[in-house]
């Protein structure tokens, strides 16, 4: 009886293995963005684009006025969720675009961190440099995203 159970268990394992290995075809990774995917990405793009506009409208003036307390507050306040939003969006892109988007997002964060340090040190020239570089990388990130037609 125990030999029969062992044999039955072995047969069930083999049948299960064959069924699992043959059951699902390989999923093909898309190479272009579908209109549905672009619409889905636009939900994530909008807050990031608003943050980019806010940088140009508000943060630039704070740096020009050398208002360092409000500069730091703006970086930690309205731009505080930017890291999460940009990395989340980068992860939603096609695999061919993900690495570049993640790299650009990290560069934007690096510039914002250095801008925050420059504001803390009240270093206007370094703050302006980091601000310009952050905008350039931010624009490169946004240009990498698919556009709704």
From Swiss-Prot:
The N-terminus is blocked. Upon expression in E.coli the N-terminus is modified with a diacylglycerol and an acyl group bound to two palmitates and one palmitoleate. Addition of an 8-His tag to the C-terminus of this protein allows purification of intact photosystem II (PSII) on a Ni(2+) affinity column. PSII purified this way has more PsbV and a higher Mn content (reflecting presence of the oxygen evolving complex) than PSII purified via His tagged-PsbB on Ni(2+) affinity columns, and has more O(2) evolving activity. This is CyanoQ. The keyword Membrane applies. A lipid is attached at residue 22 (S-diacylglycerol cysteine). PROSITE patterns: PROKAR_LIPOPROTEIN. Disruption phenotype: Wild-type growth in BG11 medium, at 30 degrees Celsius with 30 umol photons/m(2)/s; slightly reduced growth in Ca(2+) or Cl(-) depleted medium. Up to 60% decreased rates of O(2) evolution. Wild-type growth in BG11 medium, at 30 degrees Celsius with 25 umol photons/m(2)/s, wild-type growth under Ca(2+), Cl(-) or iron-limiting conditions, about 10% decrease in O(2) evolution rate; slightly slower growth in double psbO-psbQ or psbQ-psbU mutants, no growth of psbQ-psbV mutants. Increased accumulation of intermediate assembly forms of PSII. Belongs to the PsbQ family. CyanoQ subfamily. The lineage of its organism: Bacteria, Bacillati, Cyanobacteriota, Cyanophyceae, Synechococcales. It comes from Synechocystis sp. (strain ATCC 27184 / PCC 6803 / Kazusa). One of its GO terms (cellular component) is extrinsic component of membrane. Keywords: Lipoprotein, Membrane, Metal-binding, Palmitate, Photosynthesis, Photosystem II, Signal, Thylakoid. One of the extrinsic, lumenal subunits of photosystem II (PSII), which stabilize and protect the oxygen-evolving complex. PSII is a light-driven water plastoquinone oxidoreductase, using light energy to abstract electrons from H(2)O, generating a proton gradient subsequently used for ATP formation. Plays a role in the stability of the oxygen-evolving center on the luminal side of PSII. Required for optimal photoautotrophic growth in the absence of Ca(2+) or Cl(-), functions in optimizing PSII water oxidation/O(2) evolving activity. Requires PsbO to bind to PSII.
């Amino acid at each position: 009886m125990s030999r029969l159970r062992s044999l039955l268990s072995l047969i069930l394992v083999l049948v299960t293995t064959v069924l699992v290995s043959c059951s699902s075809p390989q999923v093909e990774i898309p190479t272009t963005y579908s209109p549905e995917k672009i619409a889905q990405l636009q939900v994530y793009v909008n807050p990031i684009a608003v943050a980019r506009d806010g940088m140009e409208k508000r943060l630039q003036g704070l740096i020009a006025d050398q208002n360092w307390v409000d500069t730091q507050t703006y970086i930690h306040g309205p731009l505080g969720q930017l890291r999460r939003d940009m990395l989340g969006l980068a992860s939603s892109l096609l695999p061919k675009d993900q690495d570049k988007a993640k790299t650009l997002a990290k560069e934007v964060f690096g510039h914002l961190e250095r801008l925050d340090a420059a504001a803390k040190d009240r270093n206007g020239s370094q703050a302006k440099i980091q601000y310009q570089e952050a905008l350039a990388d931010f624009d490169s990130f946004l240009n990498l995203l698919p556009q709704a037609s």
